C-alpha cells in the first residue's frame, strides 16, 4: 500500500470523508510468489457502463508477423495504472483495509472498463508505428537484423515513455528468432500453442461436474477455437445445454481421453505463417452436423499450381476453423450446405484472402462449381 501511494496509484481517503462506495481488498499470489493486491469491484461493475474497444483475436494478432524475422517482445508494467481517473470518479474505487480506506488515482484492475480504456489509449499512442503488433500489455516488433531491431526498439520505448507507459525489464526479449507472444510460440516459420498449454490438456483431469466440463471447454477454446467447435467435442458440448443433468460414464471417459490425444496430435505442430505471394487454397466442407475450412499455402516447386493436394508436406496449413450447424442448417440441401461452408470459410479468412493474388477455392460439390462457372 505504501509503495503504491508513493507511486501515485492510490491515496488514503481522508478521515471523516464519506464515500458511497467501499469494496473489499483481496490478496492473491503472483507466479513468482509475491503478493498481488486485488479489489472486488463486482458491485461497481454492475451499475457502470463499459467503454468498448475492438481488439483482434490472438491468432489474428500473431498472423501479421512475417516469417524469418528477429522478434522483440516488451511487456507494459502495470499498464492500467497509466490511465488517470477523474477526481469525481475516484471515490467509487474506495476499498477498505486494516489500515483504513484507500481509493485509486489511476484505473484499477478488476474494473470492467479499465481494459478497453487502457487498450484504446495504448492503440492511440502507437497508431502508425511500423512493424508492430500488440496484445493488451504485450508488444511485438519485428525486423530483419539485430542492428535494425536496436534502433526500432529504442524508438518504440521512447514513444511509449513519453506517454507514461513503462516496460518490465524482466520480460524483455530482444531480437530473438522464437518467442512466446499472445499465447502462441512463434518460430521463424510459424506459430503453435506453447508446450505448457499442450501439457495442460494432456494432464487435464476427468470432469466430475458441470464446472469441470466448462473448464475443459475453456482450455481447448484458448488453444484452438476450431477444435472447441469440432465434432469430437460434441458430446461434451451437450452436457452444457440448459437443464441437462451432469453424467459421466465409461463411454464419455474413453471419448474424453481420445479427444485429448487427437487435439494434441493435430495442433502440436502449429501452423505456418501466411505469405501473401504464395499460392493459397481455401478448402471448405459441409455435413449435417457441422461446417469447416482449412487455409493452406504451397511450399513446394510442383509445376501444377492448381492442385492443392499434391501430397507430402507441400501444402501447409495456415488457418483452420469449424462450427456446429444450427437446426435449420442441418436440413439444408447439399448445394446450400456447401455454399454455407464456403461463405463461412471466406468470412473467417477474410484478412488472408481479400486481395490474395493466387487464391484457389476447393469444394467437393460439383453443382456448386457449375454455378460459379455460369456466372
Q: Residue spans of the language-model regions?
A:
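C-terminal reverse transcriptase regions that engage the nucleic-acid substrate
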Residues: 173-276, 367
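A short, polar/acidic, helix/strand-boundary loop motif
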Residues: 45, 100-117, 301-340, 364-375
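Metal-dependent nuclease catalytic cores in nucleic-acid-processing enzymes
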Residues: 59-69, 121-126, 220, 337-356
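Catalytic-core region of right-hand nucleic acid polymerases
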Residues: 1-120, 159, 186-229, 332
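Acidic, metal-ligating active-site segments
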Residues: 283, 287-309
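Catalytic palm subdomain of template-directed nucleic-acid polymerases
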Residues: 28-33, 44-51, 81-87, 127-166, ...
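Active-site palm subdomain of RNA-directed nucleic acid polymerases
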Residues: 11-14, 115-156, 160, 226-227, ...
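Two-metal-ion RNase H-like nuclease active-site motif
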Residues: 72-76, 278-287, 342
